[in-house]
């Protein structure tokens, strides 16, 4: 038997939290307005108007479209220290953060890769010694926040333009093995007439050690008789950079 259709209105929910919205009029999550306001601030005033966690929120929006990402962004900054350090954090450490999935990690690494590509382009397109600030920016972007020591060589031609940028060695948290004769051999293979050596200090303090100074002098002694100049040895860290040439240490 079919029940008769009642003309009476359906009962209202007893609790207003159970209110039924008409189709097409569902209330937007509270964070949608926040996202639009944050984007608007970025469009109008740029990144300088945003704190580190707010800039990180913008990075996470696309990977996590249905979540309030502010707590996650704040947690990442608290864990790693800054926006830059979060971008450079190793993927295994990022995976330790609760709520940060592979899509979000990919977004973070994409931003880091884009920044490195931009700064490298600024170095490649100019004479290196006439764009020293671009060299420093590139070295800090690619190496300053790494959790292990890295040793990189910029090989230059006779016009001091970049021929090659090669990561030679990756070591431990406080040591990288360096082979001076291999560095000079590689310079000759590339027909480079000069090199700039770069390595990082994961501790954040770029102060040269005695081992750094001695290794630099050894490379200079091998390279110069073969026509390869050592323009500088730069050490980068979270807290700045040091130029052994500028400090007159070789």
UniProtKB/Swiss-Prot annotation:
The lineage of its organism: Bacteria, Pseudomonadati, Pseudomonadota, Alphaproteobacteria, Hyphomicrobiales. PANTHER family: DNA REPAIR PROTEIN RADC, UPF0758 PROTEIN YEES-RELATED. This is UPF0758 protein RPB_0700. Zn(2+) binds at residues 199, 201, 212. Keywords: Hydrolase, Metal-binding, Metalloprotease, Protease, Zinc. Residues 128-250 form the MPN domain. One of its GO terms (molecular function) is metal ion binding. It comes from Rhodopseudomonas palustris (strain HaA2). GO terms for biological process: proteolysis. The keyword Hydrolase applies. Residues 1-27 are annotated as: Disordered. Belongs to the UPF0758 family. Pfam families: RadC (PF04002), UPF0758_N (PF20582). The keyword Lipid metabolism does not apply. InterPro entries: MPN, RadC_JAB, RuvA_2-like, UPF0758, UPF0758_CS, UPF0758_N. A motif (JAMM motif) lies at residues 199-212. It comes from the Bacteria.
